[in-house]
């Protein structure tokens, strides 16, 4: 998945839905941390997407999404990537001009929550430039999803389609 294309698309949807006002980078990064917490909650509650039921569903796509995908580990991991991409789009980050992130993690050697904490910690290191933290987060969530055998681009595309049809700020204050 091309991070630059994702960041432009995610940011466009977010702007169209009223998510961008003059707030600090920390405000938006905290919303990513919230999504990481929601991923842990989905894991704790054993909520996994039912792709087969979703794809065979006869109800409107939004209803099928809410029934079989929403609030699952896959959905929440997609939210992490989408928020990071959105912030990258707002900041005009060009991933093609960045050196690759050298971070490596043996995901299988750590628990789900430890991996979530490592992602949170990496995103919150304010001694590192915001661009590098976002790049780290994007690479981390994609590698983590791959380790979990989650087709993250598939779930990102589903969530972006779902988000495009939601109300202003998805009915939330921010």
Where are the language model's segments positioned?
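Flexible "arm" and connector segments at domain edges
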Residues: 1-174
